[in-house]
């Protein structure tokens, strides 16, 4: 199996008899490190540090580069070339045929292990059977026909061309029409090469606007990926294409980092190490979303093979690295795999990681692609997480740059990664797990997930509304028979806020106040005063409705006020931070009235780890759960109010 998820016919390559030349050297610690946790600017960019501050993510030892002295000692042990290092896995890959050097490296006190991982018959740093065309592609007739456009509600035309179906499936045009096309966001694409991205017309706009901000080849160790395999270019095109009326991607205004981590001519777990290094580089730059259309199950050397049992999110190098990437605040979006019709059948790694968005494939009508890998992961996680178009997906041809059809979870993955990026652009104040949770809740099978599409096909408009509602805050105080009411949430000039009121002696709501939004999707404050003297003791009920353009309307809040009330908390709400958590989870609970609260935490096996019951007084209180001694992994915190479960939150212990 090749680790690139398109339905291709690949040339076979066997090097099982070749001499091992590449090894992973794993270190025991990071002692005598020349870098310091106290000075992260030495190894993390300002943007990466801003992300840590924004989402309350601590700098820890995994952020420190591998100890320089260790790396130098390995290099100087003999005829040894250092290939790549991984600070998260605390290891380096090396190239050598020097047996004496290997023995010396194994004897170092700071070396935990040395393992042979790969051989290369060629030594030019390029794939032996490099694919210059991603092959089984189906041309699209009349590709310049512009009748298949998406008409927006505000009169503009989003000229998606042939990509219309794979965007409309998710109502992705809703985000674009409101100005969210990825601008200011960064996406890393980790793949096997980006053939001709420097010249294909698909990326004219990206090149003209300098949207490619970083490039690195972790296989050849150089900064050129234009001459390698076309698969990464195909994936990139589903996000970055900007050919109005012909082919437009899901986040055409985003900035991109292109990383070649996969050697398509071989299949060894050195590529998992490369993937970890790619994640780390993306993190250090400050990338928001990583899209990975790669996966690992079986290798050229059978002793490296995984079994389905290993697909537990905690075994493979790539899954461990993907989860660490999530703990740093990025959102990894991973292909589920194309094993649905094979003996393997199930999700591959790193799609089994527990803190990533794993993507299955459907067509533009939402029908499951038979090749899309099945879930769950071996530890019972719902996999895939969700699904997007990967059956007859529209991608760029490597020969012309024009749109063609192709198949694979490879293309479903970047497609939804781009839309997720646009959603996050609208709500940068929320973290990666909040975005992932909103996407799940906005999907077609959220109530009844299955092993083919997980939570289903996400609706970006619904996810947008979910996050808008979560950001809503309200407060009111009654003083001297007057209620001062304050509402805060994000909205813009395309939106209208309708406040309706009904008194306790009335049967219907009537219009009370209408507020037209102003430019810029930012948090805005609505205030009004209710004078209770004329109401003679009646209770006033309010309903706050948001209208978006001409086709979306939803109630964001409903509340009651009477002249006998005192100040209230904004709404009944629960928030947990930080997430991921290292030591202590802070659980903030706001209630409008005194409430009996029970908080329970269980691990991934359902074992009860924490249980507390207390009387919560009206207002906001914070409870703390010390998780320092708990094992790394996924936990679920459930909040019960008066015996009824009101919220369950998945948190990651890093």
Predicted regions and their residues:
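Hydrolase catalytic cores
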Residues: 236, 259-263, 288, 346, ...
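Residue-level detector of functionally pivotal "anchor" positions at catalytic/ligand-binding pockets or at interdomain
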Residues: 465-481, 551-577, 592
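C-terminal outer-membrane/trafficking sorting elements
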Residues: 7, 17-18, 497-514, 536, ...
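Subtilisin-like serine protease catalytic core
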Residues: 20, 37, 113, 163, ...
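C-terminal subdomain of the subtilisin-like protease fold in secreted/lumenal serine endopeptidases
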Residues: 164, 285-291, 425-480, 516
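N-terminal domain-start motif of subtilase-like serine proteases
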Residues: 82-86, 98-102, 126-189, 199, ...
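Substrate-binding/access-modulating region of protease and related hydrolase catalytic domains
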Residues: 176, 181-183, 242-245, 258-355, ...
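Inhibitory N-terminal propeptides of secreted protease zymogens
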Residues: 19-141
């Amino acid at each position: 199996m090749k680790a690139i998820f398109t339905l291709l016919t690949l040339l076979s390559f066997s090097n099982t008899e070749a001499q091992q030349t590449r090894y992973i050297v794993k270190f025991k610690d990071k002692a005598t490190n020349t870098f310091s946790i106290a000075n992260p600017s030495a190894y993390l960019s300002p943007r990466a540090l801003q992300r840590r501050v924004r989402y309350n993510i601590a700098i820890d030892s995994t952020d420190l580069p591998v100890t320089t002295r260790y790396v130098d000692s390995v290099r100087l042990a003999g005829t040894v070339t250092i290939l790549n290092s991984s600070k998260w896995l605390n290891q380096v890959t090396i190239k050598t045929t020097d047996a004496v050097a290997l023995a010396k490296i194994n004897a170092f006190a700071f070396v935990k292990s040395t393992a042979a991982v790969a051989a290369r018959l060629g030594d030019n740093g390029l794939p032996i059977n490099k694919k210059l065309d991603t092959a089984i592609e189906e041309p699209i007739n009349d590709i310049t026909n512009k009748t298949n456009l998406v008409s927006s509600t505000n009169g503009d035309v989003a000229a998606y061309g042939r990509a219309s179906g794979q965007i409309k499936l998710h109502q992705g045009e809703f985000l674009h029409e409101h100005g969210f096309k990825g601008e200011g966001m960064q996406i890393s694409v980790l793949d096997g090469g980006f053939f001709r991205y420097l010249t294909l017309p698909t990326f004219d706009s990206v090149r003209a606007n300098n949207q490619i901000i970083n490039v690195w080849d972790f296989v050849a160790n150089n900064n050129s990926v234009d001459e390698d395999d076309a698969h990464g270019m195909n994936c990139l095109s589903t996000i970055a294409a900007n050919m109005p009326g012909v082919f437009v991607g899901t986040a055409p205004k985003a900035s991109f980092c292109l990383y070649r981590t996969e050697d398509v001519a071989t299949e060894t777990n050195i590529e998992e190490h490369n993937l970890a290094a790619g994640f780390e580089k993306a993190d250090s730059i400050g990338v928001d979303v990583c899209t990975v259309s790669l996966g690992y199950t079986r290798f050229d050397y059978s002793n490296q093979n995984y079994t389905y049992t290993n697909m537990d999110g905690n075994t493979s190098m790539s899954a461990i690295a993907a989860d660490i990437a999530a703990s740093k605040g990025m959102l990894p979006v991973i292909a589920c795999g194309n094993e649905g019709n094979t003996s393997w059948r199930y999700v591959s790694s790193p799609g089994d990681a527990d803190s990533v968005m794993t993507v299955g494939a459907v067509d533009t009508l939402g029908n499951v692609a038979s090749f899309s890998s099945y879930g769950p992961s071996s530890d019972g996680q719902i996999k895939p997480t969700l699904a997007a178009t990967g059956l007859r997906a529209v991608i760029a041809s490597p020969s012309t740059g024009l749109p063609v059809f192709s198949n694979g979870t490879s293309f479903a993955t970047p497609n939804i990664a781009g839309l997720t990026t646009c959603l996050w652009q609208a709500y940068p104040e929320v973290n990666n797990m909040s975005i992932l949770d909103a996407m799940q809740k906005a999907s077609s099978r959220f109530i009844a997930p299955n092993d083919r599409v997980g939570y289903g096909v996400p609706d970006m408009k619904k996810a947008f509304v979910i996050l808008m509602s979560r950001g809503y805050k309200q407060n009111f105080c009654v003083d001297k028979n007057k209620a001062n009411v304050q509402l805060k949430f994000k909205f813009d000039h395309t939106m209208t806020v309708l406040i309706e009121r009904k008194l306790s002696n009335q049967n219907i709501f009537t219009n009370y106040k209408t507020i037209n939004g102003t430019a810029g999707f930012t948090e805005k404050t609505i205030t009004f005063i209710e004078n209770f003297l004329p109401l003679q003791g009646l209770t006033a009920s309010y309903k706050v409705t948001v209208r978006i353009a001409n086709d979306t309307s939803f109630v964001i809040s409903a509340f009651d006020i009477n002249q006998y009330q005192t100040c209230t908390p904004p709404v009944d709400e629960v928030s947990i931070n930080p997430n991921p958590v290292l030591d202590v989870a802070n659980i903030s609970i706001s209630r409008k009235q005194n409430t009996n609260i029970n908080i329970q935490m269980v691990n991934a096996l359902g074992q009860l780890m924490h249980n507390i019951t207390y009387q919560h007084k009206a207002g906001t209180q914070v409870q703390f759960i010390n998780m320092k001694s708990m094992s790394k992994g996924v936990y679920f915190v459930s909040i019960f109010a008066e015996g009824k479960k009101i919220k369950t939150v998945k948190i990651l212990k890093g």
